[in-house]
Amino acid sequence: LAKRWAFHLIMRRFGLALLLGCMLLGGLRADWDFSQISRRAQALYGPLGAGQGRIDAWQQLLATQKQLSEVERLNVVNQFFNRQMRYEEDIDLWREVDYWATPIQSLIKGAGDCEDYAIAKYFSLRRLGVPSEKLRITYVKALRQNRAHMVLTYYSNPDAMPLVLDSLIDAIKPASQRADLLPVYAFNGEGLWLAGAKGNKKVGDTKRLSRWQDLLKKMQAEGFPAEPVY
């Protein structure tokens, strides 16, 4: 009888620990409270104007597209931001040479440059359940324009040819069909990669990217939860 009671006590403690673990894990993937985010954004940036409609449309997309296949989610998100935003240089939009805007800032402006498109698509797909290891924000050289450029790449598996989500074109194509892009480095919430690194090995973490860290801080100020890995 004593052994039976000891067993039940252990199982109760195990169950409590499991429940607490699930609660903590749920906290790490907390819901995005768009009412609070809009209030915070207005306090930080002033009246949202037409940006509120774009933010509402983004919220609707995130709430309704999770049932799609991953490739379908790529297409929906890619088309959404390519249509909701117009291209504008940082110096004209933010009076800075290189500024990484949050998705909220980009939607308020209805504009951004290449990294702003890639960043907004990355966070959207992460929110829609695409694992971070399948997504990389990739810095490339656009050979036709002879300039730096940034895109989002998607790997269906670690050895797959990535698909490229680009602000320059709506079509999502394999990297093998984008000879106009020369990759330089890539990153996500978990690491940093250099083009040509053997075995796709990470060469560091995103703590080395000060603009990425600043971006996460801005998103937290806007009301997004502080998640350990985006």
Predicted segments — roles?
Residues 3-16:
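Bacterial N-terminal signal peptides that target proteins for export
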